[in-house]
């Protein structure tokens, strides 16, 4: 059964496996509809999308319109200035066919200059606060990629009391001692404050490099069912964090199935074995 946990201070009892709707960036409505039926069968009750995810918000709209009460709904703005971010939030609501989203997130906020702009006077954070005051959003979060993101999120929590954070977490990346230490510091801070921690890139195998891109993801995902099981169970085996699913509807069913069968975290030896067998590499260095 899909495990659930309270999503930080929001109070929502979310499935620990969150649907990463980047998977809907470039699919037909029929493909999106079949995927949404799959989510309902597995009991997933939390969706994470973004304004920059192609057609994702548009594909979600018809379903959200009919099933709004069944999902915690999050989107993101990648704009860095207040008015541009506010306008994008309003467009996201229109595309999603809702009057309010549960969570708005400042998208991929890692670059120091962009960070200062977004969190400073006239920045995107002001738009998120305004949207919350107007009832367009309920909570505010921050997301990011890369090896510095955990440290940047810790800094962000000193600047503003964000409700959620989102960042990479997988076995290869946590072998980087600096990133691992930064992640642990962030996680401790989030636990103190009741901040929900979402994680991405659980089933990353490696960067595409020169290999043909055979999935919708911008990294090469694991395909072997045993490897996917171990990667997913390794993430879910860490208490207090959520797993946002892969951005490819073809790989998604294996991730959902693995999450549904989660019982315990694989051992370090088991993860080292699968990492070697699959030639897993960190996506960010």
Residue ranges and their predicted role:
Residues 1-71, 127:
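N-terminal binding-site loop/beta-alpha segment at the start of enzyme catalytic domains
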Residues 7, 19, 47, 60, ...:
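Conserved, mostly hydrophobic/aromatic
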Residues 12-17, 43-45, 68-72, 98-102, ...:
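Short, well-ordered coil/turn segments that N-cap beta-strands
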Residues 27-40, 82-97, 147-157, 226-232:
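Short, acidic/polar
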Residues 55, 109-285:
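Beta/alpha (TIM)-barrel catalytic core signal, keyed to glycine-rich beta->alpha loops juxtaposed to Asp/Glu
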Residues 70-81, 103-107, 167-169:
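A short, structured active-site edge motif that brings together acidic residues
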Residues 93-116:
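Active-site groove signature of glycoside hydrolases
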């Amino acid at each position: 059964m899909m495990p659930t946990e309270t999503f930080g201070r929001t109070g929502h009892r979310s499935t620990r496996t969150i649907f990463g709707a980047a998977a809907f960036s470039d699919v037909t409505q029929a493909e999106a509809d079949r995927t949404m039926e799959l989510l309902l069968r597995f009991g997933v009750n939390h969706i994470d999308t973004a304004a920059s995810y192609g057609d994702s918000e548009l594909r979600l709209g018809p379903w959200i319109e009919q099933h709004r009460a069944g999902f915690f709904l999050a989107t993101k703005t990648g704009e860095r200035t207040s008015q541009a971010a506010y306008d994008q939030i309003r467009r996201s609501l229109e595309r999603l066919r809702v009057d309010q989203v549960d969570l708005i997130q400042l998208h991929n906020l890692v670059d120091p200059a962009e960070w200062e702009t977004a969190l400073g006077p006239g920045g995107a954070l002001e738009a998120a606060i305004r949207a919350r005051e107007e009832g367009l959003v309920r909570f505010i979060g921050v997301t990011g990629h890369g090896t510095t993101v955990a440290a940047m999120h810790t800094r962000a929590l000193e600047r503003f009391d964000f409700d959620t954070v989102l960042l990479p977490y997988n076995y290869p990346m946590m072998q980087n001692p600096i990133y691992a230490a930064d992640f642990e510091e962030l996680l401790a801070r989030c636990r103190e404050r009741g901040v929900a921690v979402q994680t991405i890139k659980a089933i990353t195998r490696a960067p595409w490099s020169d290999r043909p891109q055979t999935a919708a993801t911008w990294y090469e995902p694991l395909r072997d069912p045993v490897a996917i099981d171990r990667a997913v169970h390794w993430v879910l085996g860490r208490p207090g964090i959520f797993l946002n699913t892969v951005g490819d509807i073809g790989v998604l069913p294996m991730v959902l199935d693995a999450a549904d069968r989660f019982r315990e975290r694989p051992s370090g030896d088991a993860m080292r074995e699968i990492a070697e067998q699959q030639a897993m590499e960190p996506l960010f260095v």
